[in-house]
Regions:
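Extended, charged/polar low-complexity intrinsically disordered regions
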Residues: 1-99, 103-104
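Low-complexity, interaction-prone regions
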Residues: 11-22, 237-243, 373-379
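Ser/Thr-centered, proline-biased regulatory motifs
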Residues: 15-20, 380-397
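Surface-exposed beta-strand-to-loop junctions
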Residues: 35-41, 53-78, 157-163, 200, ...
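Polar/charged alpha-helical tracts
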Residues: 39, 43, 60, 75, ...
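Walker A/P-loop NTP-binding motif of AAA+ ATPase domains
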Residues: 82, 86-302, 380, 397
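Eukaryote-specific, cytoplasm-facing alpha-helical/coiled-coil scaffolding segments in long proteins
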Residues: 133-142, 310, 348, 368-374
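Conserved AAA+ ATPase small/helical "lid" subdomain
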Residues: 238-242, 269-270, 274-276, 281, ...
Length: 397
């Protein structure tokens, strides 16, 4: 069902022919072929190999006792806004709906654009590149979901993460990097453009990374190619190109203008929570069976699920892979597996502290209060500024 469709003749060189009025962004590689640019991006590490993972590998259950927990949590948080967190199964369904289906099917992309929603002002226009943000604590499967989306759709993976582009295309050449990546992504659909640590791209300031370049150096070039103030954008909503951002610390965009730019850039913001109890049970069982343990004891699995609360799915997978090494699996027939072998390695893993998880949840609630996509003028940022000016004037008097 999910097939790759290549355009018969990638457009190069001249821009705007056949279209009246708007002119596209400057093309610094107009004299180079798509094949040459593709090889160049591969050699520079921008186009990367996709891991062999599928959406079903994001193991998790629905919240079967959600109504009970929701009622209890609502009573505890009566003084503040509260929205129940999604279960891993719901996250898997949302990523499939918003990312996999539109990217894998041109028919879905053309006739059922899922990057639109209804807000107070009416229908919001589709965004170029259909940007989607996955936010959640470290180890909650954001990177795996990126590779799963690319693998399920047979897409090319372009990595524009600041840490991956350090030392590459310095200075003014950053525009060439962004434009070339989006140009090749459009010419060879389906394509996924991945930006990890997305909060650093939208945080203002001149804080430099390890390579001497600020992480936000690609922001203005992304805006110039996707949402230009004048002229046509490089990508259109109909293109099977997905800009997928991931963030473990989205709350670092503290300033009102940074928050507005961050949430306003993405059409969808999806929260990846820590696994709940039934999801931890499923994950322990799946990982033990994958490692070579036949029919894990259900009572022992329930114990593991209880003691692994506040641990991420990544930590659970890491513990199983460390404990059940190839040599240990070969000795399972002579020395049966015991749950005690996992408790020590699990204790050495760093749990996700409640304060960190709460910060991410609060940030996600803030995006929902802005209408789910962070309209720049839909939240409290502008009102605070106006109020601040008035209060400041009174103090001066």
């Amino acid at each position: 069902m999910l097939t790759t469709r290549h355009p018969p003749h990638p457009v190069q060189g001249k821009k705007g022919k056949g279209k009246k009025g708007k002119k596209g962004p400057k093309d610094p590689t107009a004299d180079k072929s798509i094949d040459f640019l593709y090889r160049q991006l591969v050699s520079d590490g921008i186009i990367q190999k996709v891991d062999h993972v599928q959406m079903k590998d994001y193991v998790g259950s629905f919240g079967h006792l959600g109504a009970t927990f929701d009622k209890k949590a609502a009573e505890e948080m009566a003084t503040r806004p509260w929205v129940p967190e999604p279960s891993p199964a719901q996250v898997r369904a949302m990523v499939t709906e918003f990312c996999v289906l539109p990217l894998g099917s041109q028919g879905v992309k053309d006739h059922a654009p899922l990057n639109t929603y209804i807000n107070k002002k009416g229908n919001r226009a589709p965004k170029n590149g259909t940007p989607v943000l996955l936010c959640g604590s470290p180890g909650t499967g954001k990177k795996m979901l990126v590779h799963a989306v690319a693998h399920e759709t047979g897409a090319n993976l372009f990595n524009l993460t600041p840490s991956n582009t350090e030392g590459k295309y310095p200075g003014k050449k950053a525009y060439d990097m962004v434009h070339t990546a989006l140009k090749v992504a459009k010419a060879l659909p389906p394509s996924v453009v991945w930006i990890d640590d997305a909060e650093t791209v939208f945080a203002s300031g001149k804080k430099k990374g390890g390579g001497g370049e600020p992480p936000n150096r690609i922001l203005k070039h992304l805006i110039a190619c996707l949402e230009p103030k004048k002229g046509a954008a490089l990508l259109e909503p109909e293109d099977r190109v997905l800009v997928l951002g991931t963030s473990a610390e989205p709350y670092l965009c503290e300033k009102a203008k940074d928050f507005s730019a961050f949430t306003g850039f993405f059409a969808k913001v999806l929260y990846c929570p820590l696994p709940n109890y039934p999801s931890r049970s499923m994950l322990w069982t799946a990982m033990l069976e994958k490692a070579g343990v036949e029919r894990p004891n259900p009572d022992e699995v329930q114990t593991l699920a209880r003691i692994s609360e506040f641990y991420s799915a990544g930590s659970i997978c890491k513990v199983v892979s460390k404990t059940l090494s190839t040599r240990r699996v070969e000795r399972l027939a002579r020395k049966p597996f015991s749950i005690n072998e996992l408790i020590g390695p699990l204790a050495k893993e760093e749990p996700v502290y409640a304060t960190i998880e709460q910060e991410i949840q609060d940030w996600h609630l803030k995006t929902l209060n802005l209408g789910g996509g962070g309209d720049g003028d839909g939240g409290g940022g502008g009102k605070k500024k106006e109020g601040g000016k008035k209060k400041g004037g009174k103090k001066k008097k």
